[in-house]
Amino acid sequence: MVSAGMNGMTMPRRFGGLNFSITPYTMCAEIVAAKDAAFGNIWSLQDCIETLYEFGNEDQHSRFIPRVCAGETMSMDLTEPDAGSDLQRVMLKATYSEEEGCWLLNGVKRFITNGDADIHLVLARSEEGTTDGR
């Protein structure tokens, strides 16, 4: 996929993408899934790059999107032991450490598709006392 330039098909060229619309991407995803459904799942269903592009900031875009376009893998870490796939019940806590300049995670995720990925997009709660989706 990487040697064919398929990673980051819909991402802007400035990040190493092809800047294609969603239609050719969907066609490619269908072809890949027809040959190997498991690989199609990892390549397209877990397409975290779209989520990162839509909701990430410029720093995150420049740090992570070129890496994915170059062939590094991503996973979307959502499922927890007591929440299953009910994302409203996610309890993993994210706390920003001024001292370390990064987010610290406290909790458990499980059943992560592509869990050995290079980059992880993790769903966590960062506001004390929240239970709703934000």
Label every model-predicted segment:
Residues 2-70, 113-115:
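Internal helix-loop-helix
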Residues 3, 44-45, 56-92, 96, ...:
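Internal maturation/activation junctions in enzymes
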Residues 6-8, 37-41, 73-75, 102, ...:
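Beta-sheet entry/capping signal
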Residues 13, 43, 68, 77-80, ...:
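Active-site proximal loops enriched in glycine and acidic residues that flank catalytic Cys/His/Asp
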Residues 24-27, 57, 91-93, 120-122:
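Short secondary-structure boundary/capping segments
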Residues 40, 64-65, 91-93, 109-112, ...:
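A generic local secondary-structure boundary/capping motif
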Residues 102, 106-134:
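A short core secondary-structure module
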